[in-house]
């Protein structure tokens, strides 16, 4: 039986730079100016090295009840804003957008408690397909 968790998974899929990974985790779990933080289950497991979002969805390693899967892939590690891939696990599994790490708390908090829908964030991305908060 697969264990289920209440917090949202942040899965590392790029193992090329440990310090960049640590920077992503620090930025993604930092408290916002409003006092909120993403409630993440940080998953640093080499069996997910190079895994695609589709493969991660199929794996469902304890996150089958989560609303969203956060993926720290190469782009998230190399970009200064750390745009984490947000993958829908609800209405349209596999649909995705990116969110800068400093705004992840808003996505995670609101999707976890079903205060907002995935589409509300996905439709609010900038021209480069990255969510940087509501403006």
Regions found by a protein language model. Give the residues of each.
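Short helix/strand-capping turn motifs
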Residues: 2-119, 134-135
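Short linear, low-complexity motifs centered on an aromatic residue
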Residues: 124-135
């Amino acid at each position: 039986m697969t264990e289920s968790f209440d917090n949202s998974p942040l899965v590392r899929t790029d193992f090329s730079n440990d310090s960049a990974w640590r920077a992503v985790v620090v930025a993604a779990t930092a408290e916002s100016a409003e006092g909120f933080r993403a409630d993440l289950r940080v998953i640093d497991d080499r069996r997910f090295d190079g895994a695609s979002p589709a493969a991660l969805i199929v794996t469902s390693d304890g996150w089958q009840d989560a609303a969203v899967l956060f993926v720290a892939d190469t782009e998230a590690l190399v970009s200064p804003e750390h745009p984490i891939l947000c993958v829908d696990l609800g209405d349209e599994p596999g649909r995705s957008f990116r969110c800068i790490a400093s705004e992840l708390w808003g996505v995670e908090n609101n999707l976890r408690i079903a205060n907002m829908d995935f589409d509300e964030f996905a439709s609010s991305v900038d021209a480069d397909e990255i969510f940087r908060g509501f403006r």
